[in-house]
From Swiss-Prot:
Organism classification: Eukaryota, Fungi, Dikarya, Ascomycota, Pezizomycotina
Residues annotated to bind S-adenosyl-L-methionine: 270
Descriptive protein name: 6-hydroxytryprostatin B O-methyltransferase
Keyword check for Transmembrane: no
UniProt keyword list: Alkaloid metabolism, Methyltransferase, S-adenosyl-L-methionine, Transferase, Virulence
Enzyme class (EC, first level): transferase
Pathway connected to this protein: Alkaloid biosynthesis
GO process annotations (BP): alkaloid metabolic process; methylation; secondary metabolite biosynthetic process
Active site: 313
Family statement drawn from the similarity comment of this UniProt entry: Belongs to the class I-like SAM-binding methyltransferase superfamily. Cation-independent O-methyltransferase family.
Length: 411
């Protein structure tokens, strides 16, 4: 049971800390972007969120708190519906629009009264709003659909593609208690043919769905923007002269490293269609070259270091083993394997808010890929079982980063 006065005191103290950090950095308190905050500000922000949630639980009590969590399916389903109806896209950036006019702009017919019921519910959660005349206008949350294309793409992906697999978790466990069978995972079951026991993988589904494939890339852009800035500070790059960025997309991360460390020659490897786009970029860095490569085949490059950033959490243990072993074939004594991924803490270790985010990501990887986020113990076991020459060096988590850098040296 939470101590209510103690939680309230902690909340007040951390609000003061956060306000102080906001004043120092000049960031906006309601922008939702913590990247300008220092370690103290980030910690205070997490504590405020946690304390506020504890106060809600304390105020509701155990039973109502559980029911509130389950009832949030109504919130999610209603917001999901408004996004899929493309309602936020049809609301003007400024001003408002009457319901009768709004429904005429939608591709899917819906009665004005029903649409009004949906919006009058979601506005209580901060999604869309009404003006004094009862016409629809944007809230700060819904305004991302007209002001932030990448975040909007991520939201559309979640509404159309990311939420539904969660309802198949129980059925997936009945078919595959290990959670490792890619074609029996929650998403595979969602996308399977009627009556089938197996379904397609995430990437096979996206291959046939260009709309959600683009939304997925938009979502990754949001994810990358919030994390790329940590890469340059996550490792002592002065010790590296040649680097292979495996699965490095169009070289956004490689460019951050190359701009900060001009001595490094970087080879970015990815699928042919991605490398083709990368080679067409006008802002290519002179120290970066691009190469088509399937990371399930032997690594062709000899380098000082090999970098896997946000790759392994998309794959189950068997596939991760295949990926690391293909890199291992190219390792020479003194070469390093660098993995930047989320690292699950032990229960209660560190910030509870951070742990919640990481464990949500873990279950998200399971529902979409039959994959996982891993603890340090799990990551070390996976890598070191592939090649006994690899000796673990260290783990470093940059302040404010969702991911940690892990390094091994080949002896």
């Amino acid at each position: 049971m939470f101590n209510l006065p103690e939680v309230a005191t902690r909340l007040s103290q951390n609000v003061e800390l956060l306000v102080d950090e906001i004043d120092k950095t000049g960031s906006q308190p309601n922008c939702g972007n913590p990247t300008l905050l220092g370690p103290k500000g980030l910690a205070a922000r997490d504590e405020i969120i946690l304390a506020a949630e504890k106060l809600l639980q304390q105020g509701r009590g155990p039973g109502p708190s559980l029911l509130s969590l389950l009832e949030s399916a109504v919130d999610i389903g209603t917001i999901q519906t408004l996004i899929r109806l493309e309602v936020p896209d049809q609301v003007p950036p400024t001003g408002s629009i009457p319901y009768d006019a709004l429904v005429k702009k939608l591709k899917t017919p819906v009665a004005p009264e029903l649409l009004q019921r949906l919006i009058r519910f979601t506005r209580l959660a901060g999604f869309l709003d009404e003006d004094e005349e009862g016409a629809v206008k944007h809230s700060p949350m819904s305004a991302i659909f007209v002001s932030d294309p990448d975040s909007a793409g991520q939201a559309r992906f979640m509404a159309d593609f990311g939420i539904r697999p969660c309802s198949f978790i129980y059925e997936s466990i009945k078919l595959d208690p290990s959670g490792e069978a890619t074609r029996q995972g929650p998403l595979a079951l969602m996308a399977r043919e009627p009556g089938a026991r197996e379904g397609p993988t995430f990437f096979e589904v996206l291959e046939k769905d260009p709309v959600n494939r683009n939304r997925w890339h938009d979502g990754m852009a949001v994810h990358n923007d919030s994390m790329v800035r940590h890469v340059a500070d996550a490792y002592d790059w002065d010790t590296v002269k040649s680097l292979v960025d495996i699965g490095g997309s169009e070289g956004h991360v490689a460019a951050v490293i190359a701009n900060a460390f001009a001595h490094i020659q970087i080879t970015v490897q990815d699928r042919p269609e991605i490398i083709e786009k990368a080679r067409q970029r006008v802002d290519r860095h002179r120290n970066i070259t691009f190469e088509e490569h399937d990371f399930f085949t032997p690594q062709p490059r000899i380098a000082d270091a090999y970098f896997l950033r946000l790759i392994l959490h998309d794959w189950n243990d068997a596939d991760c083993t295949r990926i690391v072993r293909q890199i291992s074939s190219a390792l020479r004594p003194g070469a390093r394997l660098l993995i930047m991924d989320a690292v699950l803490p032990e229960p209660g270790e560190g910030s509870l808010q951070s742990e919640r985010q990481l464990r949500r990501s873990d279950i998200g990887m399971y529902t979409l890929f039959s994959a996982k986020e891993r603890s340090l113990v799990q990551m070390r076991r996976l890598v070191e079982d592939c090649d006994d020459r690899l000796r673990f060096e260290k783990l470093y988590t940059p302040p404010g980063s969702h991911a940690s850098m892990l390094s091994w040296i080949c002896e």
